[in-house]
A protein has these predicted regions:
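ATP/Mg2+ or Mg2+-diphosphate-binding catalytic cores
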Residues: 259-305
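Active-site activation/catalytic loop segments of kinase-like enzymes and analogous catalytic loops
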Residues: 38, 200, 206-243, 259-279
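Active-site acidic catalytic loop and adjacent metal/ATP-binding pocket
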Residues: 1-4, 10-13, 158-206
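ATP-dependent phospho-/nucleotidyl transfer catalytic cores
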Residues: 77-176, 188, 282-285, 294-305
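Secondary-structure capping and boundary motifs in well-ordered enzyme cores
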Residues: 62, 89, 171, 175-176, ...
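Generic, well-ordered alpha-helical scaffold segments in large soluble proteins
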Residues: 43, 100-103, 160, 213-216, ...
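Conserved ATP-binding subdomain of kinase catalytic cores across diverse folds
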Residues: 2-128, 206-207, 222, 244, ...
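All-alpha amphipathic helical-bundle segments outside canonical DNA-binding/catalytic cores
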Residues: 243-259, 290
Length: 305
């Protein structure tokens, strides 16, 4: 399904399954392709977060074969996860999350979307069993490239992954799940951000997206100096958009808990997708930044909801 309008731009973007069989099988098991197609079909049009327009989408959920035809947002520029960003760019990116999170905050009807749910007990149990093994594999693969603070954080976190997988009773909404610079497009003509790659969207704690972006996108000095203001501004905008009963103290605690989300993603993705030179550099950088973030926030007491 898609937009039947004749007002097509000069170019469009076609998105297809990965050619690598390991990545493709991982996406099938995780329902990643289904999530992305359904997000564009069902949710993108009703949310104020900026995304490419859908022209056509279809998927065979049994095989994982899919196609998405999306508007080309050129000349927008893709962010660079390895290079990071300035505090001003981070503020734009965090502000854009309000348009994703606020409209369906604690909306029970989200549970009617099975492809968006991640509350399956069997799935959580599988992840709780799998992730410590992937962490061991990550350390073995990268050896001395895994910094001491990453080892310290990972050894503290992954044995408690089952606690982290538990969802809180409230403060849940639609989350992106991989909200980082590589998945954002920036328009030089104005202060606009567009969000792409919705293969990890889910129902989850909003602050995981915020902490994940801040922890990955800013260097340590900028993060430490600006993260309090970024969280304050996000919380104020969230309240301004109509979210009630979510105070600043709770927001900050959820942000601390969310700092672990990036380490989980860095390790899991590194071990479950096709290995590339840039991928190795990116995942090691992510692991380093996210581990330092969690340790800076003393987040070991915030693993459980």
């Amino acid at each position: 399904c898609g937009d039947d309008s004749d007002d097509l731009g000069s170019t469009v973007i076609a998105k297809l399954p990965a050619s690598d069989p390991v990545s493709r099988n991982t996406a099938l098991v995780m329902r990643s392709y289904e999530k992305e197609v359904r997000f564009y079909e069902v949710l993108a049009g009703e949310l104020p977060v900026r995304t490419p327009g859908l022209r056509y989408g279809d998927i065979d959920v049994e095989s994982g074969s899919f196609v998405l035809i999306l508007d080309d947002l050129a000349p927008a520029n893709q962010g660079d996860q390895l290079a990071g960003c300035s505090p001003d760019v981070a503020a734009l990116a965090v502000a854009e999350l309000v348009g994703l999170h606020a409209p369906r905050w604690d909306d029970p009807t989200l549970l009617d979307l099975p492809w968006l749910r991640n509350d399956d007990p069997d799935g959580r149990a599988m992840m709780a069993m799998l992730m410590p093994m992937l962490w061991d594999g990550f350390r073995d693969r990268y050896g001395d490239a895994v910094e001491d603070h990453v080892r310290m954080a990972g050894d503290a976190f992954f044995p408690r992954i089952a606690e982290f997988m538990e969802l809180p009773d409230d403060g849940r909404t639609i989350i992106h799940g991989d909200y980082r610079l590589d998945n954002l497009l920036f328009d030089d003509a104005g202060p606009t951000v567009a969000v792409v790659d919705w293969q990890t969207c889910a129902i989850g704690p909003a602050m995981h997206d915020v902490a994940y972006f801040v922890g990955a996108g800013l260097d340590e000095h900028d993060r430490r100096e600006h993260e309090g203001r970024l969280v304050d501004d996000y919380h104020g905008a969230l309240v301004g958009a109509g979210v009630a009963g979510y105070d600043r103290e709770r927001c900050w605690r959820d942000y601390r808990r969310g700092s672990w989300a990036g380490l989980l993603m860095a390790v899991g993705a590194a071990m479950m997708v096709e290995r590339t030179e840039r991928g190795d550099a990116m995942f090691l950088t992510m692991a380093s930044r996210h581990a330092r973030h969690a340790l800076d926030l003393d987040a070991t007491d915030a693993v459980a909801p």
